[in-house]
Amino acid sequence: MSWRSDHICIELIAGSRKPSNVCWAFILFLGSLGFLLVGTSSYLGRNFIPFFPSQQIIFFPQGIVMSFYGIAGLFISSYLWCTISWNVGSGYDRFDIKEGIVCIFRWGFPGKNRRIFLRFLMKDIQSIRIEVKEGIYARRVLYMEIRGQGSIPLTRTDENLTLREIEQKAAELAYFLRVPIEVF
């Protein structure tokens, strides 16, 4: 989603609060909870899961391994739930022609550097660069080349834009900023 006027362009960036991330975190939580329950029920000799008798799984080595997988899965799912609740990676890109300033803001992980805020002068922007890698894992990323700073990605690597969409986005931004487009 973006907003544009004659002098300002604001592009909102979606973070980790995506339906696919919530789905994976939920599936991982339920699966790891199941593994932990099976491992615990094999240790205690009780049936915590009614449709799965605990006598079929002995604690050593299957119960220990399932408990370990359950605990590891709970740690990974809690990490996913934390990134979803903190909305890591979300933010905005603001291009202000009137003041000649580009501001890039992203939310990070909690701590000293939670707010990532970059400011550049528009005259330092050399070009808008499109990087395309085709194959099994196709990747199309839009970069902004800054003089003396290198490239800054403007799209997420997992955004999976089509070639037409990335070209359209690059053309609109290059036209707004009055800079050339490079393709790699």
UniProtKB/Swiss-Prot annotation:
PANTHER family with a match to the protein in the record? PHOTOSYSTEM I ASSEMBLY PROTEIN YCF4, PTHR33288
What GO biological process terms are annotated to this protein in UniProt? photosynthesis
One cellular component term (GO) for this entry is:
photosystem I
Q: Kindly list the residue ranges recorded as spanning the membrane.
A: 22-42, 57-77
Compartments reported by the entry = Plastid, Chloroplast thylakoid membrane
Coiled coil located at which positions?
none
Pfam families named in the record: Ycf4
Give the disulfide map.
none
Tree of life domain: Eukaryota
Its function, per the record, reads: Seems to be required for the assembly of the photosystem I complex.
Q: In terms of one coarse class, where is the protein primarily found? A: plastid
Record's protein name: Photosystem I assembly protein Ycf4
Provide this UniProt record's keywords sorted from A to Z.
Chloroplast, Membrane, Photosynthesis, Plastid, Thylakoid, Transmembrane, Transmembrane helix
Q: Is ATP-binding among this UniProt entry's keywords?
A: no
The similarity annotation says:
Belongs to the Ycf4 family.
Membrane topology of the entry: Multi-pass membrane protein
